[in-house]
Curated annotation (Swiss-Prot):
One of its GO terms (molecular function) is protein-macromolecule adaptor activity. The modification Phosphoserine is found at S115. The keyword Disulfide bond applies. Its main location: endoplasmic reticulum. It is a multi-pass membrane protein. This is Endoplasmic reticulum membrane adapter protein XK. It is found in: Endoplasmic reticulum membrane. Recruits the lipid transfer protein VPS13A from lipid droplets to the endoplasmic reticulum (ER) membrane. Pfam families: XK-related (PF09815). Residues 24-37, 90-140, 192-207, 256-276, 338-348 are extracellular.
Length: 445
């Protein structure tokens, strides 16, 4: 049975980040900074509450008689209790006989164009561990993008304003680790959801590549937002609201345009109001993820599983192009409106470093999809093929514009030859004209 390392990592980041935030809020209270204290506590306690609700919802404990579990979640200690429960199940799994065994069927990755279906016995303990891993993965994503991301942005903004790095703020680098880990779990969840019928095995190099990709992407995004906020405090509200509502409303707009009925089968115990609340929370999380990085999971409300399983390279390309343009514009505005606190900062060099950092994240993303994606054999087209097709399209369009004038000369020669009753000779034409004449000849046949 696989060691529950992901559960341990999720609980460690949850506890460490919460303790660091509480310590930092106490330092703000001692210094008399009530506003910073309130915001730090809010971005710490709000995701804690959402994590407790997520664990209760996934395990369906609200409809079961488990008062101790409910009490631990009310005390914000639910993840610790669940972690102890996970390791108890793991340690006792080899000692007790499984009273119930289910059989799952998974297809292996294709080899030489063939894919075999493999049956696997899953015991009761392994099934419970799978549920715990799934719950903690979702909790890590919620904690990362609804708590850690705004918390890291806030603390970095305070550091820039006060030009002082305290011990508490340095400890908040845990927030960056939490965001990167949440994005990594989001990638793994997306792969397992899209390729649910296959046996997916993620190699260590794939984890390293995703970690580097997400680290560069999220770090540069947070720094860009902080720099822009430090000089244009009012306009950053506009930027955040436009980003948030664009991604929040996008799944709903697609749902309304599809004309599909309202989804009723998300959870049998939920009413229509409860389903609406769950969908609203999912779109809120979807918008929060896309605010800082690319969401590997694409929300699709008209789908019974709420997740789109198609691999849309064009949506990925458009997202990173628009995000790169947005980051560049925000950095240029910061450069023109920067204040005296950046007197000793080489602004052009900083802008160049941030843009190179974002391009580095895109490079690691392309490397992951090209070489380390566990299901790359199932892609209809690889990253390199899509990139080559895009380059060919650009080159073809530019060549077509350049060959407009030779085409005119060809038409004149053809008309003259036709009037004389002679066959045109391609040897007198330029190479470009010869290619075009061949294409015309083929099309006419």
């Amino acid at each position: 049975m696989k060691f529950p390392a992901s559960v341990l990592a999720s609980v460690f980041l949850f506890v460490a980040e919460t303790m660091a935030a509480l310590y930092l809020s106490s330092t703000y209270r001692s210094a008399g900074d009530r506003m910073w204290q309130a915001l730090t506590l809010f971005f710490s306690l709000m995701p804690c509450t959402l994590v407790q609700l997520t664990l209760l919802f996934v395990h369906r404990d609200l409809s079961r008689d488990r008062p101790l579990v409910l009490l631990m979640h009310l005390l914000q200690l639910g993840p610790l209790y669940r972690c102890c429960e996970v390791f108890c199940i793991y340690c006792q799994s080899d000692q007790n006989e499984e009273p119930y065994v289910s059989i799952t069927k998974k297809r292996q990755m294709p080899k030489d164009g063939l894919s075999e279906e493999v049956e696997k016995e899953v015991g009761q303990s392994e099934g419970k561990l799978f549920t715990h891993r799934s719950a903690f993965s979702r909790a890590s994503v919620i904690q990362a993008f609804l708590g850690s991301a705004p918390q890291l942005t806030l603390q970095l903004y305070i550091t820039v304003l006060e030009q002082n790095i305290t011990t508490g703020r340095f400890i908040m680098v845990l927030s960056l680790l939490s965001i990167v880990y949440g994005a990594l779990r989001c990638n793994i969840l997306a792969i397992k959801i899209k390729y649910d019928e296959y046996e997916v095995k993620v190699k260590p190099l794939a984890y390293v590549c995703i970690f580097l990709w997400r680290s560069f992407e999220i770090a540069t995004r947070v720094i860009v937002l902080v720099l822009f906020t430090s000089v244009l405090k009012i306009w950053v509200v506009v930027v955040i609201l436009v980003n948030f509502f664009s991604f929040f409303l996008y799944p709903w707009i697609l749902f309304w345009n599809s004309g599909s009925p309202f989804p009723e089968n998300i959870e049998k115990a939920l009413t229509r109001v409860g389903t609406t609340i769950v969908l609203g929370f999912l779109t809120l999380l979807y918008a929060g993820i896309n605010m800082f990085c690319w969401s590997a999971v694409q929300l699709k409300i008209d789908n019974p599983e709420l997740i789109s399983k198609s691999q849309n390279w064009y949506r990925l390309l458009i997202y990173y192009m628009m995000r790169f343009v947005e980051n560049s514009v925000l950095l240029l505005l910061w450069f023109f409106f920067k204040t005296d606190i950046y007197m000793y900062v080489c602004a052009p060099l900083l802008i160049l470093q941030l843009l190179i950092g974002y391009c580095t994240s895109i490079l690691f993303m392309l490397v992951f999809y090209q070489f380390f994606h566990p299901c790359k054999k199932l892609f209809s087209s690889s990253v390199s093929e899509s990139f080559s097709a895009c380059l060919r399209c650009v080159c073809w369009s530019s060549a077509r514009r350049k060959s407009t004038e030779p085409v005119g000369r060809i038409d004149t020669d053809l008309k003259a030859c036709t009037d004389q009753g002679a066959q045109p000779s391609t040897s007198k034409l330029t190479p470009e004209a010869t290619e075009i004449w061949t294409a015309v000849d083929l099309c006419s046949t």
